[in-house]
Amino acid sequence: MILRETLIELSEAKLIDSEILMNESKHDSSLYLVGYSIEMALKSKICKIFNFEKGFPEIKNEFTNYKNNLGCAIEKLNDIKNHDLNKLLIYSGQENTVKKELLDEWKIILEWNPEWEYILNIGDKRKNQKIFNSAKKLITLILK
């Protein structure tokens, strides 16, 4: 299990690391991390909305225990243990808020792809700044 508090700390730390890398013109690494900062924030909200008191489930048995005890609406662990930001947004309970208040920023962050880990020259300073600024606003909204 990953504690909800740990997910929040990781989200904030990855955002800080992304900014440091961006300021050092390490745009590929910065862009890669910024998406994970959003992912961690959304997963922390999933813990809250589904009352995952022991944390975010990492393995099938942990998830099955939650499902059996809470009767939650999530059918399988892969529904929430993934990098699909749209799917995570839905399960986080934040979809309406995010799309109402920060739709443009959400559309920008959806450019992110975990496969960026394997790609060179995915972005420049302008793209990095745009995605980073969007992520920062989104994380502030999601975690409030």
Task: Show where each model-derived region lies.
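Terminal alpha-helical segments
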Residues: 1-144
